[in-house]
Amino acid sequence: FKNKRGGDEIVVQCDEGNTSTSVYDVLKQFSDNSDLKVVEFPLNNNFADFKNNLKDACSGNYIFQIDADEYPDDYLMATVEEVIKMNNSVDVFWVPRINKVDGLTQEHINKWGWNVDSSKRVNFPDYQCRILKNVKRIKWKNKVHEVLIGHKSESYLPANDEFCLIHLKDIERQEKQNKYYDTL
């Protein structure tokens, strides 16, 4: 909330029927004192539908979509509005992401075909399409490993740490997530 500007809207989407009451309790604390909007939609093992519902719930000209297990660098949040204004003809912006997995071994790296740099960043810059113009023709497709379609122009933010989303997890969570994706 510290980077929220006057016209900004924060929309949090919860997986209908699969979100704990403790999550709702935290969201209620924030929504009582801000412009936080909470929407529910069933994930139903379909990430594209889930993201499209979130997109439909947003009213701004652009959407900066961040997953629940990510957070943006402070510099990125401080400059994102300026980046969009300077490039307002761009439909989508690809944002670099720093992935770090605590407990990752060489065996995991080999098994999943990952690249890990000297800073222990996995597959850096791992660009994600996360800033998008809020127009009907742009939407997500594919149940898993979803892709954005309908955009006419795109731009990539610099692969500098200050422009990154940060995505941290431990190896147990990563293994569980990979197994889940394999079932879809």
Per-range role (PLM):
Residues 40-47:
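Short, acidic/glycine-rich phosphate-metal binding loop used to engage nucleotide
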Residues 68:
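Walker B catalytic motif
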Residues 3-5, 58, 85:
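Short, conserved loop/helix-junction motifs that constitute active-site signature segments
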Residues 26-30, 57, 83:
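Alpha-helical structural signal in soluble globular domains
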Residues 9, 60-62:
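Well-ordered beta-strand positions
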Residues 47-55, 62, 71-184:
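Catalytic-site signature of metal-activated, phosphate-bearing donor transferases
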Residues 2-40:
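Acidic donor-binding segment of Leloir-type glycosyltransferases
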